[in-house]
């Protein structure tokens, strides 16, 4: 059970000390309130000049080793069905409970169909694909065994994990937020330090509520000026990635700032932080301000009453100090940003809609020239081709990047009173059940269906195609998702990343088109802020202060016993050969494609490792030029791949 509770003032002052043991600190970082650690700062101390990232990081460091590795406390843990099965298995094997069930929120999103649920009975009968069904069933079994809060498919609050956290107020400023998912960076829009973790780390957080991490560098991207007509946050972040590249933020936490960012809504800020991963960063952050506070004010898990006032006072202190130092500074002029889209197979392959594809013959660097040619060959567009007018087969409006109510309103404003091109299959997938219900109250669903767009249920859908929503080989899609890698939305599928308005325009015209040339309707009755979310029974509000004894005495579910634990086995030490891979910013999709993620077993990477690079996707034949396939390398096992 997740509760919104408060901290007594005398406990909060102890958070100023860094020499407390983990268990002692944990009694103060209670439930969902370490987010707004009610610092009264009554104990004098020296305030260093710090960035937003510095402040949140420093407040969560429990211990630091000589090499800089830190043990940090984790405030929020979001869980879904794909990256959690092996983590729960590890807890069972060690006979451990989840340390903080009240700080953990789970849902299903990646594998589930987004077709109508009018006849939904249970996951077993609803999900037809066996591996997807198994992962979802396994999550439900683990939720029951370990006593966690769960938004299942029959729950109106179910949705994409990075949509439901913010709309419930589970995500709050100054928290550390993790999830076994790359796009956890979304939550940084609230001034939280949010980043994706691997399955082994998921297990570590479930067991200890801590992580071992090294501090990243500070990077500031300041966007100044008023955004031009037709330009959205999606265009801004695509432009930024085009400027700095997909490796530009490597090793950094990016703080997005400037008057352009300050003028954005929370939904828009979430879209930008969501794609900071595509810029190579560990996380993206925006300092909390009045826009943040107004968004959070009525959320079910936000502080209430006097706690709210104290929380806001603390949150306001998080902004980077005027003289704070950054390792990297980037300045962007908003006047330089037009409606932007991708032309190739990397988020850095961007041009304005008025631009054209590049010409490899004009690129001097041989590695870059080869990459551009490969991208053009895959995407099926010739060099120097104008992007406007490229025919599309499908339109996808959804994903954790662009599936919130603001995104749907923007798309509906373009679609209203028009019809989709007859050859286009267009789908709109709300990010959560609450977003879907709000859109239906506003009549957005009817606008879409009247135009021939398919109105779906909440889920990740076509963003990565682990569910039935996939592109067929050769199909071209205007997509509001975050990644356009080869095969991302389906084997052989071709993806162009665009804003919701640009996707809607492509659906109407049947081709990539400049939304600025489209008639855009007013959507009557649309509130400026996101809808107020109702507080439901599963969330308890507790106004009284909670002392430390009541925290550890709360019931915690214990997994089924597996007998006496034999203790943790000794670590295996591996030594081997480091093979060079001349590719920048290697992403998780490249390391292990999505089709190999549908397992609940600890299988290792095996044949999945760099599958798209090691094998021809059409024939399955081994690529003799890939580094791990070279016969000159000694016989070894590579991360689970045996090379004989």
Curated annotation (Swiss-Prot):
Q: What's its EC?
A: 4.2.1.33
Q: Which reaction does it catalyse?
A: (2R,3S)-3-isopropylmalate = (2S)-2-isopropylmalate
Q: Where is this region: Disordered?
A: 521-568
- InterPro entries, per the entry: 3-IsopropMal_deHydase_lsu (IPR004430), Acnase/IPM_dHydase_lsu_aba_1/3 (IPR015931), Acoase/IPM_deHydtase_lsu_aba (IPR001030), Aconitase/3IPM_dehydase_swvl (IPR015928), Aconitase_4Fe-4S_BS (IPR018136), Aconitase_4Fe-4S_dom (IPR036008), AconitaseA/IPMdHydase_ssu_swvl (IPR000573), IPM_dehydratase_rel_enz (IPR050067)
* One annotated GO molecular function: 4 iron, 4 sulfur cluster binding
Task: List positions binding [4Fe-4S] cluster.
Answer: 400, 460, 463
Compositional bias of kind Acidic residues: 537-547
Q: Which key words are in the record?
A: 4Fe-4S, Amino-acid biosynthesis, Branched-chain amino acid biosynthesis, Iron, Iron-sulfur, Leucine biosynthesis, Lyase, Metal-binding
Cofactor requirement: [4Fe-4S] cluster
Q: Name one Pfam family in it.
A: Aconitase
Signal peptide extent: none
Instruction: Give me the comment on cofactor binding.
Output: Binds 1 [4Fe-4S] cluster per subunit.
Choose any GO biological process term that the UniProt entry carries and state it: L-leucine biosynthetic process
| Enzyme superclass (EC) | lyase
Spell out the family assignment given in the record's similarity comment: Belongs to the aconitase/IPM isomerase family.
Q: PANTHER family, alphabetically?
A: 3-ISOPROPYLMALATE DEHYDRATASE, HOMOACONITASE, MITOCHONDRIAL-RELATED
Q: What does this protein do?
A: Catalyzes the isomerization between 2-isopropylmalate and 3-isopropylmalate, via the formation of 2-isopropylmaleate.
Which named protein is this?
A: 3-isopropylmalate dehydratase
UniProt lineage: Eukaryota, Fungi, Fungi incertae sedis, Mucoromycota, Mucoromycotina
Gene name for this UniProt entry: LEUA
